[in-house]
Curated annotation (Swiss-Prot):
The gene is leuS. It is an enzyme of class 6 (ligase). Belongs to the class-I aminoacyl-tRNA synthetase family. InterPro entries: aa-tRNA-synth_I_CS, aa-tRNA-synth_Ia, Leu-tRNA-ligase, Leu_tRNA-synth_edit, M/V/L/I-tRNA-synth_anticd-bd, Methionyl/Leucyl_tRNA_Synth, Rossmann-like_a/b/a_fold, tRNAsynth_Ia_anticodon-bd. A motif ('KMSKS' region) lies at residues 576-580. This is Leucine--tRNA ligase. It comes from the Bacteria. Its main location: cytoplasm. ATP binds at K579. Keywords: Aminoacyl-tRNA synthetase, ATP-binding, Cytoplasm, Ligase, Nucleotide-binding, Protein biosynthesis. GO terms for molecular function: aminoacyl-tRNA deacylase activity; ATP binding; leucine-tRNA ligase activity.
Length: 817
C-alpha cells in the first residue's frame, strides 16, 4: 500500500474497475426492490459548474447508499440538449449548434466520469437526437387527434432579443428569463397543449405528494390558482353586447363603481382607433411585461371610454374604463371594480376620482377607514339591498342564486393556469410535426414519415429561425390531398423534451415505441433532485405529461416523482456563483489538484443538501487532509499484518469503549442518512470516530480487531461519498469483493450498551456538576449521588428541595428554594 494518498491513481483504478465490471448497469430482472434515483439532467454548456457538481454528488451518494441497502438502483444520465445558448454560441463562434452541442456533451461526459458518478451510461440519451424527439412528435400527433392539441392566435410574450415566444413562467419581472430583454406583446398563431384539462387533477394530487417540499407544492397550488366564483354579465348601454366578468367576491357586487377593460380587449382596440389616450394604453400593453408582480406595482393608468355598463341587480349605470392593470389572458379581459374592497381597484379609483362605496363591514364592528385603503376581508354586508346584514359567505350563495335565477350569471370554477403554448420561433429545437395546406388546413405528419428531422448543417445569423429560409425543409406535399404545402417551421418549447425524459431512460434503446414495459417497471422516480427554480416550469409540465402518458396507456403510475429534493445553491462570498459576478470556482481544477473524492466530500460536508452551501477554500483543503489521514490510518493498520477475529467478550473496558464509539457512529450515520439525508452530520460522526481510532495505541490482538472493525465501519459509511478511496481501502483491509457490493453497516445493539453513564447535575436548571453511575441507576440512586457532590451541596444547603427531575442516562435537576 502506498505511503502517501495518491488520489489520481486511486481514482483511475476505481473508475476502470467499475467500467470493466459494468457495475452500475441496471437490469430489470433483479429480485431486489427497484430504486430509481435521478438528478435533473444538464444543458450541455461545455463545462460543469459547482451547482452541477453538488446536484450530481447528492444524487450519486443517495444512489450508492440505496444500493448498499439492497436496492436494485437505476441512476441514468443524459442531456437536455436543445435551447437558445447553442444558437447564441453558433452566432459567436460560427459553429453549427449541433456540432457545438455534441462537442460539449463529450467534454461534460468525461467530467462526470472523472467525478466517479455511478451512472448507467448504457441508457444515455440526448434530446437533440432524432430517435428521441421522434416519439415526442408521435405523441403530439396522438394528442392532436384527441383534441388535446390546438392552434390559436393568441397574445404572446415576445422576446425581441431571442426572437421567440416565452411562456408566462419564462417572463421574470417583465423581462425574458434568458436574454433579460423587456418582453413585448404580440398576436401570432401558436400551438397549445390543453394542460387546463388536467388542472383539477394536478391540483388535488399535490396533497398526495408528501415526499415533496411543501414550498414547491404551494408554488404549484398558487400557479394553478383554482378559485370558485360567479361569472356574470353587465349589459352595455346603447350597444348590443355585454361585458362578462368573473368574480370570487359576489358579496361585493353592490360596491361596483366602474368596469375595467384590458387594453387588448376587443372594445379597447376598437375605441383606440379614435381615442389617443386608449391607443397609448394599448401600445404600452403591447410593449410592456405581463408579470403579475409587475402589474401589482405598476402605476395605475387608464382612460374613460365614455361607455356605461348596467348593473345586473340595481340597473345603475357604471362607467367603463380601460385600465392597465387588467390582463386580457385572465378571464375575459374585463373586471368589475369594487374599490372599497380591492386594493388595485382602490388605487385606480383614487387616482381618477372614481366613487368608492363600501358594502362589506368588519364582522367585529370595527370602523372602516376607506380613505386609507381597501377592506378586502370578509365581513357583513351593508347597502346591498335585500342582502344587507348577511355575512359574506351566506351572501355569496344568495347573490349567486339570484343571478342564476335571473339568467345573469352562474357559479363556476376558474384557474390561473393557462394552456401551455409550445411553439417557439427558434431553430435549435424539435420540429413540430404539422403541415399547413391551403385547402385542408393543419394536417399531422403521417406516423411513417416520423421523425421530422431538424437539418443540422445550418448557419445561424440571428433575427429568427433559419428554417423559414430553407425551402428544402419546409416545402412538402399535403398528406391528405397531395397539393403543395408547407411544414411548420416553429419548434417545440424545450420543456417538452424534459417533460418525459425520465420515462425514456427506462427504455432508451427501444426503437419501435415511445416507451415499453420497462418504463412501468422503473417509474415513478423514487428520488428526484434539482433546483427549486423549476417548481412551476419543468416540475408542473412533467406532472402533466406523465398523466398524459398514463392516459395513453404508456405508464400506469399517476405521478412521475415520488420524492423531491431541492438542493440549495452554491454561494461564494454570500452570493450565488455566476460568471457575471466573477465568483465562480472551476470544479475541474479542484479535481485535478485534490481529487474527485475531496470535492465530493466537501460538497456533502459543508451543508445539508437542501440548504445553501458557502464555498470555502480552507474547507476543501480540510476535506483533503481528512482523506489523507484516513488513508494513513488504514496504511498503518494494514502494515502490521492481518487483524485477528473480534471476540466482543474478550475486550478490556477501553477496547469496549472504542467499540461502542464505532457502533454509535454506525447508528448515527444510519439515522442521519436514512431518515433525513443529512450526510454532513454522518461525515462529522465518522471524523470523530477516526479521531478516536487515531488515538487508540493498542497493538494487542483484541485492540487490532476493534481497529479493523472501526476502519471498516468508516470506509462503509464513506463509500457512497468518497467511493474511489473507499474502493481502494476496502481491498487493503483484506476484502476480496468490492465495497460497492457491500451492505450498509448495522449497529450491534449489544455494543451500544453502556455499563456506566455520566449524568449532568443541575440545581434550579443550572449546571453544577456531573456524576457517574451504573447505566441502570434509578432516580433514588441518582439523587443520592447528586446531593453527595460537594459543589451541589453548596447550592442546596439551607434550602428546601421542592422537586427532582430525572432523565435516565442524561441528567438530574434539583429544584431547591
Amino acid at each position: 500500500m502506498d505511503n502517501q494518498y495518491q488520489p489520481k491513481e486511486i481514482e483511475a483504478e476505481a473508475q476502470a474497475y467499475w467500467e470493466q465490471q459494468q457495475t452500475f448497469q441496471a437490469r430489470e430482472d433483479s429480485a431486489r426492490p427497484k430504486y430509481y434515483c435521478l438528478s435533473m439532467f444538464p444543458y450541455p454548456s461545455g463545462r460543469l459548474h459547482m451547482g452541477h457538481v453538488r446536484n450530481y454528488t447528492i444524487g450519486d451518494v443517495v444512489s450508492r447508499y440505496k444500493r448498499m441497502q439492497g436496492y436494485n438502483v437505476l441512476q441514468p444520465m443524459g442531456w437536455d440538449a436543445f435551447g437558445l445558448p447553442a444558437e447564441n454560441a453558433a452566432m459567436e463562434r460560427g459553429v453549427p449548434p449541433a456540432a457545438w452541442t455534441r462537442e460539449n456533451i463529450g467534454a461534460m461526459r468525461e467530467q462526470l466520469k472523472g467525478l466517479g458518478f455511478g451512472y448507467d451510461w448504457s441508457r444515455e440519451l440526448a434530446t437533440c437526437d432524432p430517435e428521441y424527439y421522434r416519439w415526442e412528435q408521435w405523441l403530439f400527433i396522438r394528442l392532436y387527434r384527441k383534441g388535446l392539441v390546438y392552434r390559436d392566435t393568441a397574445a404572446v410574450n415576445w422576446d425581441p432579443v431571442d426572437q421567440t415566444v416565452l411562456a408566462n413562467e419564462q417572463v421574470i419581472e417583465g423581462r425574458g428569463w434568458r436574454s433579460g430583454a423587456l418582453v413585448e406583446r404580440r398576436e401570432i398563431p401558436q400551438w397549445f397543449l390543453r394542460i387546463t384539462d388536467y388542472a383539477d387533477e394536478l391540483l388535488e394530487a399535490l396533497d398526495e405528494l408528501d415526499g415533496w417540499p411543501e414550498q414547491v407544492r404551494n408554488m404549484q397550488r398558487n400557479w394553478i390558482g383554482r378559485s370558485e366564483g360567479v361569472e356574470l354579465s353587465f349589459d352595455l348601454a346603447g350597444r348590443d353586447e355585454q361585458l362578462t366578468v368573473f368574480t370570487t367576491r359576489p358579496d361585493t357586487l353592490y360596491g361596483v363603481t366602474y368596469m375595467g377593460l384590458a387594453p387588448e380587449h376587443p372594445i379597447s382596440l376598437e375605441l383606440a382607433e379614435h381615442h389617443p389616450a386608449i391607443a397609448e394604453l394599448v401600445e404600452e400593453a403591447r410593449s410592456g411585461g405581463t408579470a403579475e408582480a409587475d402589474l401589482a406595482t405598476r402605476e395605475k393608468r387608464g382612460a374613460d371610454t365614455g361607455l356605461e355598463a348596467i348593473h345586473p341587480l340595481t340597473g345603475e349605470r357604471i362607467p367603463v374604463w380601460v385600465a392597465n392593470f387588467v390582463l386580457m389572458e385572465y378571464g375575459s379581459g374585463a373586471v368589475m371594480a369594487v374599490p372599497a374592497h380591492d386594493q388595485r381597484d382602490w388605487e385606480f379609483a383614487s387616482t381618477y376620482g372614481l366613487p368608492i362605496r363600501p358594502v362589506v363591514h368588519p364582522a367585529d364592528g370595527t370602523e372602516l377607514d376607506i380613505a386609507a385603503g381597501a377592506f378586502s376581508d370578509y365581513g357583513v354586508l351593508a347597502d346591498s339591498g335585500p342582502f344587507s346584514g348577511m355575512p359574506s359567505d351566506r351572501a355569496f350563495a344568495a347573490i349567486a342564486e339570484r343571478l342564476e335565477a335571473e339568467g345573469r350569471g352562474q357559479r363556476r370554477v376558474q384557474y390561473r393556469l393557462r394552456d401551455w403554448g409550445v411553439s417557439r420561433q427558434r431553430y435549435w429545437g424539435a420540429p413540430i410535426p404539422m403541415i399547413h395546406c391551403a385547402d385542408c388546413g393543419p394536417v399531422p405528419v403521417p406516423d411513417d414519415q416520423l421523425p421530422v428531422t431538424l437539418p443540422e448543417d445550418v448557419e445561424i445569423s440571428g433575427g429568427g429561425s433559419p428554417l423559414k429560409s430553407m425551402p428544402a425543409f419546409y416545402q412538402t406535399a399535403c398528406p391528405q390531398c397531395g397539393a403543395d404545402a408547407e411544414r411548420e417551421t416553429d419548434t417545440f418549447d424545450t420543456f417538452m423534451e424534459s417533460s418525459w425524459y425520465f420515462a425514456r431512460f427506462a427504455c432508451a434503446d427501444q426503437d419501435g415505441a415511445m416507451l415499453d414495459e420497462r418504463a412501468d417497471h422503473w417509474t415513478p422516480v423514487d428520488q428526484y433532485i434539482g433546483g427549486i427554480e423549476h417548481a412551476v416550469l419543468h416540475l408542473l409540465y412533467a406532472r402533466f405529461y406523465h398523466k398524459v402518458l398514463r392516459d395513453e396507456g404508456l405508464v400506469s403510475s399517476d405521478e412521475p416523482f415520488t420524492r423531491l429534493l431541492t438542493q440549495g445553491m452554491v454561494l461564494k462570498d454570500g452570493t450565488k456563483m455566476s460568471k457575471s459576478k466573477g465568483n465562480t470556482v472551476d470544479p475541474q481544477e479542484l479535481v485535478d489538484r485534490f481529487g474527485a473524492d475531496t470535492v465530493r466530500l466537501f460538497t456533502m460536508f459543508a451543508a445539508p443538501p437542501d440548504q445553501s452551501l458557502e464555498w470555502s477554500d480552507s474547507g476543501v483543503e480540510g476535506a483533503y487532509r481528512f482523506l489523507r489521514r484516513l488513508h494513513g490510518l488504514v496504511r498503518d493498520h494494514v502494515a502490521a499484518g492481518p487483524a485477528p477475529a473480534l471476540d466482543p467478550q474478550a475486550l478490556s473496558d477501553t477496547q469496549r469503549d472504542l467499540r461502542r464509539k464505532v457502533h454509535e457512529t454506525i447508528a448515527k450515520a444510519s439515522d442521519d442518512v436514512g431518515k433525513r439525508l443529512t450526510f454532513n452530520t454522518a461525515i462529522a460522526a465518522v471524523m470523530e470516530l477516526c479521531n478516536a481510532l487515531g488515538k487508540a495505541q493498542d497493538d494487542s490482538a483484541a485492540g487490532r480487531a476493534v481497529m479493523q472493525e472501526g476502519l471498516e465501519a468508516a470506509v462503509l459509511i464513506l463509500a457512497p461519498i468518497t467511493p474511489h478511496l473507499c474502493h481502494h481501502l476496502w481491498f487493503q483491509l483484506g476484502h476480496t469483493a468490492p465495497v460497492v457490493e457491500a451492505p450498509w453497516p448495522e449497529a450491534d445493539k449489544q455494543a451500544l450498551v453502556r455499563d456506566e453513564v455520566e449524568l449532568v447535575v443541575q440545581v434550579n436548571g443550572k449546571l453544577r456538576g456531573h456524576v457517574t453511575l451504573p447505566a441502570d441507576a434509578d432516580q433514588q440512586q441518582a439523587q443520592e449521588a447528586a446531593l453527595a457532590e460537594h459543589n451541589v451541596q453548596r447550592f442546596v444547603a439551607d434550602k428546601e428541595i421542592k422537586k427532582v427531575v430525572f432523565v435516565p442516562g442524561k441528567l438530574i435537576n434539583v429544584v431547591a428554594k
